[in-house]
Amino acid sequence: MSNKKDVAVKISGGKKIREAREKVKSDTLYNLTNAVERLKSASYVKFDPTLEIVMKLGIDSRHSDQMVRGVVNLPAGTGKTVRVAVICKEEREEEAKSAGADLVGSTNIIDEIKAGKINFDVCIATPDMMVAIGSVARILGPKGLMPNPKLGTVTLDIKNAIKNAKSGQVEYRAEKAGIIHAGLGKLSFSDQDLLKNLNAFIEAVIKAKPAGLKGSYLKAMYLSSTMGASVQIDLTSIA
């Protein structure tokens, strides 16, 4: 049975949610600057939430020629600590460690993956390890962790790949119904830094438009914060 203190906390929490919702109008379209301002003023959680973007694209992701996927280096970073694993031959392990990799190895890491031990956010591999890594493709693939040359995670340039992963590289991929979702920094970032990240991400997705696509490419865009409000972006305000 709840005591008076518990009831007071619930009432206070409910009031904060109502007040937050009142600051964002569901029937209004916002430009990026106003959207960031509104989301900050409407946030009521006690942790530092992530600014999230959802983009609806006019593609059919079931067709291979309409796949939209890539990576973006966010100018202001993500605000998250990224654990990087590097799978390489023994002669390059010291190089990977010196570059800041959190986990370095070869078949030992692959064995850990098979055992369900995945203690990393990004997996980088040298080309000569890809045959061996193929044995865990079904495990890494669904988690978005499979090294891919198109994403810069299968490379001979280990140092630069680690640097990119640690400094705020974000992968994007259109899922079913042409939806792209990504986190683009913490709400505690300055408005300027969040806008830099937003513009860099949006520009990259727009440039990734399939060459043969007919009709409208960018259908809708929404910004939100973790456990917070969501606002729709006025697409005419996107340069």
From Swiss-Prot:
GO annotation (BP), single: regulation of translation
rRNA-binding found in the keyword field: yes
Record bears the keyword Ribonucleoprotein: yes
InterPro entries recorded: Ribosom_uL1_bac-type (IPR005878), Ribosomal_uL1 (IPR002143), Ribosomal_uL1-like (IPR023674), Ribosomal_uL1/biogenesis (IPR028364), Ribosomal_uL1_3-a/b-sand (IPR016095), Ribosomal_uL1_CS (IPR023673)
Keywords: Repressor, Ribonucleoprotein, Ribosomal protein, RNA-binding, rRNA-binding, Translation regulation, tRNA-binding
GO cellular component, one term: large ribosomal subunit
Superkingdom in the source lineage: Bacteria
Pfam entry (one): Ribosomal_L1
Subunit structure, interactors included: Part of the 50S ribosomal subunit.
Listed NCBIfam families: rplA_bact
Function: Binds directly to 23S rRNA. The L1 stalk is quite mobile in the ribosome, and is involved in E site tRNA release.
The name this protein goes by in its record: Large ribosomal subunit protein uL1
Organism: Rickettsia africae (strain ESF-5)
